[in-house]
């Protein structure tokens, strides 16, 4: 379980500036629902002074994503665009009295959304470096340019650091070799030598290997407490049942539609449909499920029309 500061909890349970800003003239979209994290930042900018008058956010992600987005909107209000662009992802984390290392990618996403919103306001196009050859992590659609920029901005030195800040390498691990290559080049540029960290899984194998034959056999079932699909579905339903009364008090509800691998499809109904807080509701559900199941899952909203098609 991650240790969150009181400020992170405050911005998660009582987020500031949730929802789209009315009359926004700057919009920044980053992330992807299919990858489990998405953020839209909307700004209202005074065209004569370039001062940010108001800011709002809509996000689909974990509690740290909500807290980081909430913090960012508070930080930028009253600043000029150029002043706001000086805010780093570390500044966002510091504003929240710190984030767990595994959640630093949420602050990076906030900074990217701010850059995208400013570019949108100025009519600029953010360089698209997501060419096929530049894509490093296919699981989370992270390109080489983002990996390099994040390594430089945060002085990262390990694959684990890169995963914490960008999510690259957090899926199938096939991109670890490419990440190590980039780390080798970037560390060399700042006069350092990259040393690959030992893989924790290998240490476990070394310890177990000398054990007598009966011990590993006895340990095998206990070492793999994987839930069956039926058990997973039951746990998911239990979590939704616990959340449902809160939604029903606001005349909303949530329904489990399907579970496909790590994808959990749900349908929001009643007042939850089209609610500005819907993305936050989904993010909260996803966080609860991850904690309950002990594995990463993506909560994906299904519209009424899509649900009807699934039933046919």
Curated annotation (Swiss-Prot):
Record GO biological process: iron-sulfur cluster assembly; nitrogen fixation
This protein's record includes keyword Methyltransferase: no
Impact when changing residue 139 to A: Slow diazotrophic growth, loss of [2Fe-2S] EPR signal
Cofactor note: Binds 1 Fe cation per subunit in a rubredoxin-type site.
Source organism (scientific name): Azotobacter vinelandii
Protein name: Nitrogen fixation protein NifU
Binding-site list for [2Fe-2S] cluster: 137, 139, 172, 175
Keywords annotated in UniProt: 2Fe-2S, Iron, Iron-sulfur, Metal-binding, Nitrogen fixation
Stated role: Involved in the formation or repair of [Fe-S] clusters present in iron-sulfur proteins.
Outcome of substituting residue 137 to A: Slow diazotrophic growth, loss of [2Fe-2S] EPR signal
Record note on disruption phenotype: No longer grows diazotrophically (without an external source of N).
Gene Ontology MF annotations: 2 iron, 2 sulfur cluster binding; iron ion binding
Assembly behavior: Homodimer.
NCBIfam families: NifU_proper (TIGR02000)
Similarity-based family: Belongs to the NifU family.
Statement: the UniProt record of this protein carries the keyword Glycoprotein: no
Cofactor(s) of this protein: Fe cation; [2Fe-2S] cluster
InterPro entries associated with the record: BFD-like_2Fe2S-bd_dom (IPR007419), BFD-like_2Fe2S-bd_dom_sf (IPR041854), FSCA_dom_sf (IPR034904), N_fixation_NifU (IPR016217), NIF_FeS_clus_asmbl_NifU (IPR010238), NIF_FeS_clus_asmbl_NifU_C (IPR001075), NIF_FeS_clus_asmbl_NifU_N (IPR002871)
Highest taxon above the source species: Bacteria
Residues at which Fe cation binds: 35, 62, 106
A Pfam family hit: Fer2_BFD
Impact upon substituting residue 37 to A: Increases stability of iron-bound protein
